[in-house]
Amino acid sequence: MKKVILLLLSACSIFACTHTPKWELVWEDNFDGAEPDTSVWSRIPRGKPDWQNTQSFDDRCYEMRNGLLILKGIVNDNTEADAAQYLTGGLWTKDKRAFHGGRIEVRARLHGAKGAWPAIWTLPYETDKYSWPMGGEVDIMERLNHDSIVYQTVHSHYTYTLGIENNPKHGNTIPINPEDFNVYGVDFWPDSLVFHVNGKRNFVYPRIETEQEGQFPFNIPQ
């Protein structure tokens, strides 16, 4: 999997422009070193949630080669030491790097496998202050198994705890060619999240007027 991660900020006032700004690149990582930049990235530790219960520090799950960051899922050959049937590699920026507003894009190729669940997503930087799902979750990309579609979704107290998933619609799918590198992105605006793949807009999640709490908690550093 090759990931080129970009953060771009609008050159105009996000309150004044009409969401067609000129973007200014403020940060990128092309993973062209021998190892991921440890001032930005850490390996994700094992955890209880489904997405985290096979995460491993095993070096076999990580590779940097020819400008590629390769995150792998492998069969665990030592279940006496670790009961997980599979081991997977993952990186996050937790406690190291955060951004507020702008566009995030990730270029990646996803190899399919039964049970595979690769994902690219954001959570609030201050996780101790904003417990899930109160601070929201932005799924820039999720893919299942050998699918030729990806999911782009938001989660929050409004969508998850209150179960309001269609007012407004909280996610959408879009076809991809799994054999290609694809660019997955989201634009953070004060009044909406705009999701896109390969520059094509997929869907918009707007902030709406509602008496229910937690509908749009995304105007915080991610």
Residue map of PLM features:
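Bacterial Sec-dependent N-terminal signal peptides
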Residues: 1-21
